[in-house]
């Protein structure tokens, strides 16, 4: 299955793929998920609908992969030797402008996720689950190094804390998350909860 999927996706250069993803994100910002069509993406990118469907299979998958390409670094790959260092690399690898754009997109997709099980599954499979797995890997290394107690009850809730911050800040303070806020949140909430 993975070979068929990679063969299906190998016909477009990485540069063209990035161009298509950016066009999808631009259209999402302009019209929202519900009004986004493969016809509009094809017109914007001067490609055929057949190419889009061959490459991505569905609108939900295309949207999820476009969002995934905005992630600056895979959390699984971060390993500085300390949890503080790992979180600092995670924050430094983030871009304030991109986080502001992503916050607006996520806010716009919140309703669509509840209305579209296919979008919900695509976002979980391609965006949320890989990030949570990477974060859990990072946290497990901290446990293995003795930085966090293996029975720390907060370990299971770190993804919830971080995702919650991205949702709550725009709602409460009407501003997107930025690196300064993330550092402050991690130092004031995440590390104390982990006993670090």
Model-derived features with residue positions:
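Basic, helix-initiating cap at the start of DNA-binding domains
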Residues: 1-44, 50, 61
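Helix-loop "lid/cap" segments that line or gate small-molecule binding pockets
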Residues: 92-99, 106-115, 186-190
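C-terminal peripheral helix-coil segments that are non-catalytic and often amphipathic
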Residues: 1-7, 89, 96, 133, ...
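Hydrophobic alpha-helical connector segments
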Residues: 75-104
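Short amphipathic alpha-helical segment with a characteristic S/N-K-E followed by hydrophobic residues
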Residues: 20, 35, 58-63, 73-74, ...
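Amphipathic alpha-helical packing segments from all-alpha helical-bundle domains
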Residues: 96-108, 118-145
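Hydrophobic/aromatic-rich alpha-helical bundle segments in the mid-to-C-terminal region
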Residues: 121, 125, 129, 143-188
